[in-house]
Amino acid sequence: MLPNGKPDPASLSDRQRRILEVIRDAVVLRGYPPSIREIGDAAGLQSTSSVAYQLKELEKKGFLRRDPNKPRAVDVRHLPETDNRTKAGPKAKARPTAGASPQPELASSTSFIPVVGKIAAGSPILAEQNIEEYYPLPADIVGDGELYMLQVVGESMRDAGILDGDWVVVRSQPVAEQGEFVAAMIEGEATVKEFHKDASGIWLLPHNDSFAPIPAENAEIMGKVVSVMRKL
C-alpha cells in the first residue's frame, strides 16, 4: 500500500496487471467481470486454481475487494493505468479505449457463481459436485447468500418455463416455502421441482403432466432456485 492508503501499482507483476486489464475491459464493455476461465485464457494461465490464486493476491494488494456480506461478490477498484506493451499469454488483446472510462474506481458488485454440474428435471440423475468454473452475474439479479449454478436436464419443469439445458442459480438453504422452486436431493440424486406440503405429506411437483409428483418426506432441500438463465 502507498502512504495514502491506495494500492501500489509497483507491487503488481506483469501477469497481475494483465488480469486487472482483462477485468477492466469486461466491466467497461459489458458491465461485469469475466469468468475465471476467460481470465485464464487472456493471462496465459492453464488452470482455474492458478487464476484463483492470482485473484486472491490482487485482493490482498487492494486491487479487488470482496464483500463479506455477499459471498463471491467482488468489487473491482483502483485499476492502474497500463499500456498495450506488456501482455501475459498468447490470447492477449489490446484493451478498448473509445468511449470508455479508463479507470473506474468501483464497479457494481458481481457474484462469481460456482458451476457445479448438472441437475435432473425429469428422472433424477446423480448431481456432479465438482466445481467446473465460476460464472460472473450481477449481484442485484441473483441476490445474497451461498449461491451455485446447476444445469437442468429433462422436461419435467417445461410448463414452468424451466427447460432442458437451462441454468438455474440456487441459493443454499435447508428449508423452503410452499410453491417455491427448489433443488432437492433424493437418495443421493438431485432434482429441481416445486416444493409442496399438504395433509398427505411433502411433495416435489413437476410442471409437466407426463411426470408424476415425487414423495419427498425423506428429501433434503439443497436450496431455492433464485434465477433461471437460457442461451438462445
From Swiss-Prot:
EC number(s) given by UniProt: 3.4.21.88
Pfam families in the record: LexA_DNA_bind (PF01726), Peptidase_S24 (PF00717)
Similarity field: Belongs to the peptidase S24 family.
GO biological process, one term: SOS response
Quaternary context: Homodimer.
Top-level EC class as recorded in UniProt: hydrolase
Organism: Corynebacterium efficiens (strain DSM 44549 / YS-314 / AJ 12310 / JCM 11189 / NBRC 100395)
DNA-binding region(s) in UniProt: 36-56
Repressor listed as a keyword: yes
First and last residue of the signal peptide: none
Protein name, as recorded: LexA repressor
Record's catalysed reaction(s): Hydrolysis of Ala-|-Gly bond in repressor LexA
Skewed-composition ranges (Basic and acidic residues): 62-86
PANTHER family: LEXA REPRESSOR, LEXA REPRESSOR-RELATED
CDD domains registered for this protein in UniProt: S24_LexA-like
Site residues (Cleavage), renumbered to this chain: 121-122
Function: Represses a number of genes involved in the response to DNA damage (SOS response), including recA and lexA. In the presence of single-stranded DNA, RecA interacts with LexA causing an autocatalytic cleavage which disrupts the DNA-binding part of LexA, leading to derepression of the SOS regulon and eventually DNA repair.
